[in-house]
């Protein structure tokens, strides 16, 4: 059973832009843990549409402010581009592909999504003030050894720069690039810096919570694609994409529709090949601020031992700020302490997402959903 701790520290952050401020975040839903039954039968997976077609062509890829604008737009619409850095790479291309799929555009089109991004994100940057809560959520002395971490109250951020970069869905080098002349590692409370104009991720607003089944969200289907490092979430029964005359199969389709069955997609880091458990499982529990059971034997061999440490909750926990366990014992989706490594490094066996993406999952899926790992 996962152990949890109640962390209910709230503080505000003033974020503002010269023309338009970053929007305030949606309320964070709540969750508690439940043990998954590894012997529970898996539900049959509903049919789901796949993201077919070529990735958007390189020649249409935006640069400069437009690149940041596009990444913010995709991020805010649940098509995660990875970290916001103004350098659209493969994850941004996959997010554009997903957005095009949903909206009925050619898979390799950049024009439609950029037009939408320019309308939705007129100002890609905002000015943010470092909140007073950093005094409780930044610990420069956070140890690296698991035995010492087990003695801590919380797995906090190691610097204000890390706190602010995760808050605004980017990494520290990009934050430094946006703020030339500022000593990004010497920030203090009430300092102001330029940040991507995204809805901020408020780690300090999270509390020990649990999520129950939901009639709509529990019927959805999660596809974890370990070949392209992406998780996609579908409605239980996607709508027909092509409307045609069944009595005249040789006739051209009447129309092509957007795939409204695709709900969201996010970049992931899958587990090491020897630990990946392919198949279809059930989402059993969703836990915010989980304590992590550090079992060296389990991580190295896949076999659970009785010699383990309990690592406290927090944004720098190896499982991040949320655990979404499946009916396959020990396998689940979770956050991470290193968002910049998503898609670039293997985890021990689970599916890692950036904390700002992982915490959105309870707004999209709930216990009872199927999780297909392929």
What are these model-derived regions, one by one?
Residues 8-19:
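Hydrophobic h-region of N-terminal signal peptides that target proteins for export
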Residues 18-63, 67, 125-127, 247-251:
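Compositionally biased, proline/threonine/alanine/serine-rich low-complexity intrinsically disordered stretches
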Residues 205-334:
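Gly/Pro-biased beta-strand-loop elements
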Residues 75-79, 97-105, 165-183, 198, ...:
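Sec-exported extracytoplasmic/periplasmic mature domains
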Residues 90-136, 174-211:
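Extracellular LysM carbohydrate-binding repeats and other cell-envelope/extracellular binding modules
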Residues 54, 60-93, 132-169:
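Primarily a LysM-type cell-wall glycan-binding module
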Residues 300-374:
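Exported/periplasmic cell-wall-interacting domains
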Residues 151-243, 265:
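Secretory/export targeting leaders with adjacent low-complexity proregions
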């Amino acid at each position: 059973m996962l152990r949890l701790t109640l962390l209910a520290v709230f503080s505000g952050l003033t974020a503002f832009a010269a023309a338009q401020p970053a929007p305030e975040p949606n309320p964070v839903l709540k969750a508690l843990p439940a043990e998954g039954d590894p012997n529970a039968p898996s539900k049959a997976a509903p049919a789901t549409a796949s993201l077919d077609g070529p990735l958007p062509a390189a020649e249409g890829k935006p640069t400069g402010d437009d690149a940041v604008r596009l990444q913010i737009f995709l991020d805010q619409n649940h098509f995660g581009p990875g970290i916001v850095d103004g350098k659209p790479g493969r994850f941004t291309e996959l997010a554009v592909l997903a957005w095009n799929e949903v909206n009925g555009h050619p898979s390799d089109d950049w024009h439609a999504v950029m037009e939408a991004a320019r309308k939705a994100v007129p100002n890609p940057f905002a000015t943010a003030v470092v909140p007073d809560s950093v005094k409780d959520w930044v610990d420069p002395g956070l140890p690296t050894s698991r035995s010492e971490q087990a003695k801590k109250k919380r797995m906090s951020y190691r610097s204000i720069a890390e706190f602010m970069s995760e808050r605004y869905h980017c990494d520290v080098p990009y934050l430094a690039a946006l703020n030339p002349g500022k000593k990004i590692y010497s920030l203090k409370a009430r300092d102001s810096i330029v940040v991507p104009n995204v809805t901020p991720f408020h780690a300090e607003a999270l509390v020990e919570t649990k999520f129950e089944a939901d009639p709509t969200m529990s019927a959805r289907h999660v596809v974890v694609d370990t070949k392209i490092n992406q998780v996609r979430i579908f409605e239980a029964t996607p709508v027909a994409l092509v409307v045609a005359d069944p009595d005249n199969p040789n006739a051209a389709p009447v129309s092509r529709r957007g795939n409204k069955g695709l709900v969201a997609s996010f970049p992931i880091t899958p587990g090491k090949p020897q630990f990946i458990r392919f198949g279809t499982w059930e989402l059993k529990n969703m836990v915010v601020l989980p304590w992590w059971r550090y079992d060296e034997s389990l991580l190295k061999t896949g076999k659970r031992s009785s010699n383990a440490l309990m690592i406290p909750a927090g944004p720098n926990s190896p499982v991040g700020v949320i655990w979404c366990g499946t009916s396959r014992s020990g396998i689940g989706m979770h956050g991470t302490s290193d968002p910049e490594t998503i898609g670039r490094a293997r985890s021990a066996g689970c599916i890692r997402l950036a904390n700002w993406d992982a915490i959105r999952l309870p707004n999209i899926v709930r216990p009872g959903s199927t999780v297909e790992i392929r």
